[in-house]
Amino acid sequence: MLGKRLKIARINAGLKQAELGVRAGLDEESASARISSYENEVHAPDFRLVRKIAVVLDVPEAYFYAVEDGLAEVILQYHRHRKMYRAVE
């Protein structure tokens, strides 16, 4: 689940794997390979890295961990709505 959502969020953000990795603090030489391994669920990032990735992609960490796709979408919509609401205040 995390891999699929990571790839979707990255593509929606218009970033290449290497760009996302570098912005999240990964070494430039291995950034693309590491993000690829996370997207393909060969390896799993630790929570600290997921938090950094979430900041770069502007999605909540919970989006990556929701068991059901429907719940993940609700989490994402809530995040967007909350962000818009705060901008209006």
Where do the protein language model's features map onto the residues?
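Conserved hydrophobic/aromatic packing and binding residues within compact polymer-binding modules
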Residues: L6, Q17-G21, S32-Y38, F64
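Residues that mark the N-terminal boundary/hinge immediately upstream of a DNA-recognition element
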Residues: R5, K16, D46-L49, P60
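Short basic helix-loop element that most often maps to the first helix and adjoining turn
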Residues: K4-G25, H81-R86
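The short coil/loop that forms the "turn" connecting the two helices of the helix-turn-helix
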Residues: L15, L26-S30, V59
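Interfacial/linker helices and their anchor residues that mediate assembly or domain coupling
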Residues: D69-E89
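Short, basic-rich loop-to-helix N-cap that marks the start of a DNA-contacting helix
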Residues: G14, S32, N40-V55, L71
